[in-house]
Amino acid sequence: CAVNALLADGDVLYIGTERGLFIQKDGQLLQVQTDKNMLAACNRIMDLCLNEDKSVLWLATVQGLFSYSLKDGQINSWHFRENVPEADYFRCLTRIGETLYLGTMSQGVVCFDIPKQTFAHTVSLGCDVISDISGDGKETVYIATDGNGVHFLSHKDRKVVRRFFHDVNDKEGIRSNSIYSLLVDDRGA
């Protein structure tokens, strides 16, 4: 089955696939499904991240947001909007503090407040197709759009503080506003 996301944490590897979550630890491979039906859309895991104390694994799926407790295996789910086509669900996520930032195919970036367990929209980026999202873990969320370049969102102020976009007059600029992936190094560059 197709692998959509990998997350390494020490000697543990979390693998998000089209058929659920796989956890490789101590030479063993454990499969975890959000639904008993292997073909259910919620088993299509697009991205993964850990909470602050590494006790919960967050799963962005095409049918909502899921949490998987690494202590007891309990699975919980949240849905931003009910009865929305599969494309409106989550394809990427990152976390800063107690906030998850989730990229969607048609709703832009959505925030999830972990303690309050509530969703909210962030500012408009001029393109609601989010292809990748990353963060520095402290202050900045980096967002790639499929049509309006790259945006740097302030976690504290919830506004865009910088952006890169295609400009025909800038020969040194990016060549397209369709950006499909981001890689942020430990310096936030």
Residue ranges and their predicted role:
Residues C1-A189:
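Carboxylate-rich, polar loop motifs that coordinate divalent cations or form catalytic acidic clusters
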